[in-house]
Amino acid sequence: MLMTKEVLSEFAELIRENKCNPYSGNLKTGVDLGTANIVIAVTDEDNHPVAGATAVSKVVKDGIVVDFVGAMQTVRRLKAQLEELLGVTLETAATAVPPGIIDGNVRCISNVVEGAGFEVINVIDEPTAAASVLEITDGAVVDVGGGTTGISILKDGKVIFTADEPTGGTHMTLVLAGYYGIPIEEAEKLKKDKDKENDVFPIIKPVVEKMASIVKRFLSGYEVDCVYVVGGASCFNEFEQTFEKALGITTVKTNDALLVTPLGIAWNAGADCA
């Protein structure tokens, strides 16, 4: 886990500073179409972070693309940004979907990535992508996104169960908007303001507890000793403690939880010739 934290910190800095690591050989690209953010991750063949880019987005809702053109334009813009930074053309990519969505929605997500100029060579479910970065062989991964919470259970390195529930960061935003009587946009900014976290978290805590109760229901019947939480909506200091108390199972969250899944998608992509 220590190595994972270092890799995620490095990847986060690359995005924050808009810079790239030196590399040799071929590159792998992952595209994560999230409800709140679109992230592109680029790694070398050995899965070391090389570059990344992210954009706030509202083009996906509960794992369904609701603005195809907007999604395609955002991915195309991020792709061009990274190509300029790297000095190469990124031709192939993997992408990911929430567990259990219908084939038509899977195809739509792939079409967005292809419409932005990539050849899609792999589609993986989001919690499984995260599990590869966390190097988990046994346990459960819970990916708390903007619109959905995805669950994958692993045994001996194999995924034995996946599920997805339409609850996530958007529901936290709605609770804040209702509590304070403010517009959704203002509530979203408030939710992300780290200086206000001590005021915000007690209000959205019941949403986190509800998420845990949903996960607990899915985990019943399976032997799970540890739950690993990722995803942008889990980025509160007290999230994992609250989740663990409601779930009754040891809960672990790494740093830069928003970036775990995008990096895992890239790890599960084939390599472009650089």
Task: Please provide the spans of the model-predicted regions.
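Nucleotide/phosphate-binding catalytic cleft detector across ATP-hydrolyzing
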Residues: 1-35, 39-144, 158-274
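Short glycine-rich anion-binding loops that position phosphate/pyrophosphate groups of nucleotides
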Residues: 147
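A structural feature that tracks compact, well-ordered secondary-structure segments
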Residues: 150-152
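A cytosolic small-molecule/anion-sensing beta-strand core signal
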Residues: 155
